[in-house]
Amino acid sequence: MSWKIIFTKRAEKDLKSFSPEVKKLIAKAINKKLLPNPDSALIPLKGKLKGIYKFRVGTYRILCEKRSTTLVIVVVKIGHRKEIYG
C-alpha cells in the first residue's frame, strides 16, 4: 500500500506563491523522499506544534500531519524555514 498526499487549501496557496523551479524541487522531494518512506523523512515537532511533522526540502519546510491508520499525509503549510514556524 502506498501513502497518499493531501494538500490543505492553505498549503495549496503557499505552493502557488513559489517559482516554478521551487515547485519542481518540492514535488521531486515529495515523490522521491517522502512518499517511499515517510517514517524516515518526517521529523516530529515539539511545543505548540506537537503532532505536526516537518519535511525538509533545501531551505524550505513542509509541515504535515501523518494519519498512519489511513496512510495519508496532510500537507498543512509550506514555506521558507525562517517564516514557516511563526
What do these predicted regions represent?
Residues V57, K66, V75-I78:
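Residue-level recognition of conserved beta-strand positions in structured domain cores
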Residues M1-R56, R67-T70, E83-G86:
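Basic, Lys/Arg-enriched alpha-helical interface segments
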